[in-house]
């Protein structure tokens, strides 16, 4: 799967400003600017980055008239990727606050709110999340959708409509999050997979935990994915139980069914509490299998090692450094936003990265860490980016950060978001157009 070209029938989107000819004096991260460091000029043509040259620093006569934009050293990233959201739960904490700490209390509270999930309610909250994501610079958003019965839930149909409406602004993917036990029945596994496969942007998923682990069910799920040509995204080992084996089993079955590059394990918290030999052996298998990891720092920090009246000792963050060292594709996501699982937050991968810099000691944040919030490759939705040349000019500019060096943007608010070089969120400051 590859991202669709930017196009939309939405009037406000179509009426966006003219495409600049050159973005001058941009600061790119090292991971997508392999040549000599320094400010760059990005030359745009036909909605793509045609070439990148070193910024000479000299004034360009009539630059504004030619449609050039001067960024004055502002950081620029390719379009952001939100690899893991829960749009069906977002913005419901006022209706469904958890009664206690931890994952199980959050699940109970969220289930209690499902009586309120009408089509209008689901659509309104999802549209709010999509608008927030667009303003953050997100181009691809994958949401997990609670699915506890054989037939697809109402949210699945609502999000299919929204996917079509938002195409060209945000590519919306939907993953069913179902109890693994539903896949014990091979026929039901095939039925669910067929429904997912018939949905544009559909991805097959399940909740895999030590309390419900079933090798047979996971095998049926992976076999169905292979049969229907589906990608897979599992809530795997979202716990701090050393005996959890969901990630290891997934890697083994991904190899068996030839699913390299099509499987992601989200959370994978248990790796952080396993003995080094077990954890690293699992990561070696993940690397060989071509499985990706999605780290979700906000909810893992909040829900793992959570006990009333006690300060948590453990972070619940998966082994990000060790995974990257093995060439495993890694992405960072926002996960839950203002619901029973996380009462705060927003749909913004940059916020997730800022939290991961602290929780997982990711550095340098801009030159290396930022790759983890632009990584559609980790979702099986494109190749790994090493250069912007030839790619669509889907960019995120941080114009409030005219800082020298290669530090993290001084101000990540007030972003300017481009699709095909055209501004779809934010506005250029007057000095950029002078």
Indicate residue ranges for each PLM-predicted region.
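Histidine/acidic residue-rich metal-binding segments in metalloenzymes
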Residues: 154-168, 184-292, 309-332, 385
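C-terminal cap of metal-dependent C-N hydrolases
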Residues: 368, 372, 388-434
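N-terminal metal-binding scaffold of metallo-dependent hydrolase/deaminase domains
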Residues: 1-63, 402-403
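Alpha-helical scaffold segments that flank or form the walls of functional sites
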Residues: 76, 93-144, 150-165, 191-197
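Histidine-centered catalytic micro-motifs
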Residues: 78-90, 145, 231-240
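His/Asp/Glu-enriched, well-ordered alpha-helical/loop segment
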Residues: 252-263, 303, 314-400
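Active-site gating loops and adjacent loop-to-helix segments of metal-dependent hydrolytic enzymes
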Residues: 90-122, 197-200, 228, 246-267, ...
């Amino acid at each position: 799967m590859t991202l669709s070209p930017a196009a939309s029938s939405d009037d406000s989107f179509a009426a966006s400003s003219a495409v600049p000819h050159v973005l001058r004096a941009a600061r790119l991260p090292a991971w997508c600017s392999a040549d000599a460091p320094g400010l760059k000029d990005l030359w745009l043509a036909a909605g793509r980055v045609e070439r990148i040259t070193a910024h000479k620093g000299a004034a360009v006569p009539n630059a504004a008239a030619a449609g050039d934009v001067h960024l004055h050293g502002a950081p620029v990233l390719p379009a952001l990727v939100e690899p893991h959201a829960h749009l069906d739960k977002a913005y419901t904490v006022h209706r469904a606050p958890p009664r206690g700490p931890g994952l199980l209390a959050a699940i109970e509270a969220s289930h209690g709110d499902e009586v309120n999930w009408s089509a209008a309610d689901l659509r309104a909250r999802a549209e709010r999340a999509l608008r927030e994501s667009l303003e953050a610079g997100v181009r691809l958003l994958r949401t997990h959708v609670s699915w506890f019965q054989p037939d697809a839930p109402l949210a699945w149909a609502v999000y299919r409509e929204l996917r079509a409406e938002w195409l060209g602004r945000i590519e919306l993917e939907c993953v069913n999050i179902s109890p693994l036990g539903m896949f014990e029945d091979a026929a039901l596994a095939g039925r669910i997979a067929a429904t997912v496969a018939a949905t544009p942007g559909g991805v097959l998923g399940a909740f895999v935990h030590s309390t419900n682990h079933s090798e047979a069910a996971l095998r049926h799920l992976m076999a169905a994915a292979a049969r229907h040509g589906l990608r897979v995204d599992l809530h795997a080992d979202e716990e701090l139980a050393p005996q959890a084996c969901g990630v290891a089993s997934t890697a083994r079955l991904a190899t068996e069914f030839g699913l390299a590059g099509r499987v992601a394990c989200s959370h994978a918290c248990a790796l952080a509490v396993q003995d080094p030999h077990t954890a690293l052996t699992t990561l070696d298998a993940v690397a060989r299998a071509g499985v990706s990891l999605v780290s979700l720092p906000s909810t893992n920090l909040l829900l793992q090692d959570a006990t009333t009246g006690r300060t948590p000792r453990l972070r619940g963050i998966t082994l990000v450094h060790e995974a990257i060292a093995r060439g495993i594709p890694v992405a960072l996501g926002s996960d839950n936003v203002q619901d029973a699982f996380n009462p705060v937050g927003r749909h913004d991968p940059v916020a997730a990265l800022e939290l991961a810099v602290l929780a997982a000691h990711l550095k340098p944040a801009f030159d290396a860490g930022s790759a983890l919030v632009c990584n559609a490759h980790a979702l099986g939705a494109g190749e790994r980016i090493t250069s912007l040349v030839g790619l669509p000019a889907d960019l995120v500019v941080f114009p409030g950060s005219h800082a020298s060096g290669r530090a993290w943007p001084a101000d990540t608010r007030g972003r300017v978001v481009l699709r095909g070089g055209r501004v779809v969120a934010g506005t250029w400051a007057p000095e950029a157009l002078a």
